Amino acid sequence: MEDFVRQCFNPMIVELAEKAMKEYGEDLKIETNKFAAICTHLEVCFMYSDFHFINEQGESIVVELDDPNALLKHRFEIIEGRDRTMAWTVVNSICNTTGAEKPKFLPDLYDYKENRFIEIGVTRREVHIYYLEKANKIKSENTHIHIFSFTGEEMATKADYTLDEESRARIKTRLFTIRQEMANRGLWDSFVSPKEAKKQLKKNLKSQELCVGLPTKVSHRTSPALRILEPMWMDSNRTAALRASFLKCPKK
C-alpha cells in the first residue's frame, strides 16, 4: 500500500500526510491504510478548493489554471494540511475577521462566499452512516458537512452541495480511479476491511513487494491549492527535487 500511495499521489500531498501522521505519533510503515486515507482526504480538500474564486461582485466563479483572472480572491481557505498550531491560527483569524463562530474541532475549509466552515469526509462505507457520525461528533449547525464515497455517492448538509456539478464530478472520478487502481493491485479489500488489512500487514512484513505498473490517469500537475500551501512548509529546491522524483519506480 505504501508503494501505491507514493506512486498515486502528488509528492507534496504524500509529505503533508507524512507530517500529519508524525505529528500524531503514527507509523505510516505500519498504518498504511491510514496513510492512504489521509492522502485521499487531502487531495479531495485541495480539489474542492481548486479553480474557485470570488469576483468583485461577490459571485463565485470557476477559473482554470494560468487564467489572468487568477488573482481574484480564493473562495476557500484551506485549513486541512497545516500543522495544528497554524491551523488554529488560521481558524481564529477567520473568526475574528468574519465573525464566524469558532468550531470545537478543526474543520477542513472555510467558504468565504457562504461564510461557513466545511468538514470534508471521504468514506469507504455508506455515506449516510459516515455523515451521521460526523454530525454527532461536530454537533454544530455552523459547520457544513460534505461527504464523498469511492462509489460516486455524496451527502451534504441540507442537500447543499456547495460546488457546481462538474467540480464535484472531478472529485468523484478521482476517487473512483483510486478505488480501481487499488483493486487492480489487490489492495482494495484490505483498505475497506480491518481484518483484511491485518492479513495484508503480515504479508508485507514477510516480503516487501516491488512497486508494479504506474496508476493510470494520474495528474502530474501541481494543484493550485498546493501552490498556496507550498511556501509555508517547503522551499523551492526541495519542491523541485520531489517533482523530479515523482512516480519513479525501482527497476527489478
From Swiss-Prot:
It is found in: Host cytoplasm; Host nucleus. It comes from the Viruses. Keywords: Decay of host mRNAs by virus, Eukaryotic host gene expression shutoff by virus, Host cytoplasm, Host gene expression shutoff by virus, Host mRNA suppression by virus, Host nucleus, Host-virus interaction. The record marks 202-203, 206 as: Important for efficient shutoff activity. The record marks 195, 198-199 as: Important for efficient shutoff activity and nuclear localization. The keyword Heme does not apply. The active site is at residues 80, 108. Interacts with host RACK1. Plays a major role in the shutoff of the host protein expression by cleaving mRNAs probably via an endonuclease activity. This host shutoff allows the virus to escape from the host antiviral response. Hijacks host RNA splicing machinery to selectively target host RNAs containing introns for destruction. This may explain the preferential degradation of RNAs that have undergone co- or post-transcriptional processing. Belongs to the influenza viruses PA-X family. The probable endonuclease active site in the N-terminus and the basic amino acid cluster in the C-terminus are important for the shutoff activity. The C-terminus acts as a nuclear localization signal. The C-terminus is recruited to host protein complexes involved in nuclear Pol II RNA processing. This is Protein PA-X. It comes from Influenza A virus (strain A/wyoming/03/2003 H3N2). The lineage of its organism: Viruses, Riboviria, Orthornavirae, Negarnaviricota, Polyploviricotina.
